[in-house]
Amino acid sequence: MHPTPDALIVIDIQNDFCPGGALAVAGGDEILAPVNALLEAYQVKVLTQDWHPAGHGSFASSHPGAAPFSVTTLPYGEQVLWPDHCVIGTKGADFHPDLNTDAADLIIRKGFRAGVDSYSAFFENDHETPTGLDGYLRTRGVSRLTLVGLATDFCVQYSALDAARLGYDVTVREDACRAIDLDGSLEAARKAMRAAGVVLEG
């Protein structure tokens, strides 16, 4: 019997989330070296990529008079309205050039449906529409996941919570993540992840 493979899920290390990008996470480029090192250490390696059409419903610019980082209600619930970011075909949507994308087995693109955002690597923000990642991991025999990337309190947190809900053993390596920390969102994310049984390391 082969041991169950562990998977590394690398969340959204894209130009728009790194310094100089449209939705830059402070220190977002500082995690590239530790993430690249981790990519050498795991059997199963998945990258996620935020991938929005122009005029996406989560963009503040799609809601006349709305300010970036304000909150609105969309058909699936509350939604933070973001600056335009990770628009399909733009440099901002590309992976950071220093990320070792060649190491990945799979790239999951999310948020490409114009009417619903997708923070999680597993489900869109309606919490129902799957990305296909769960099926991929199960057919690879994976039961343990380590999550790294951007941003701790949004896409990493949502991915970790969904993974725990789906029955995976989940670890988040905080030393290989960075947070937006919008109005205390980082501490709230840590509490939610711990409550769900997610292990926070680093």
Per-range role (PLM):
Residues 2-8:
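Extreme N-terminal starter segment of soluble prokaryotic enzymes
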Residues 142-155, 174-178:
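Glycine-rich anion-binding loop/nest that anchors nucleotide
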Residues 172-186:
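Short, flexible loop segments at boundaries between secondary-structure elements
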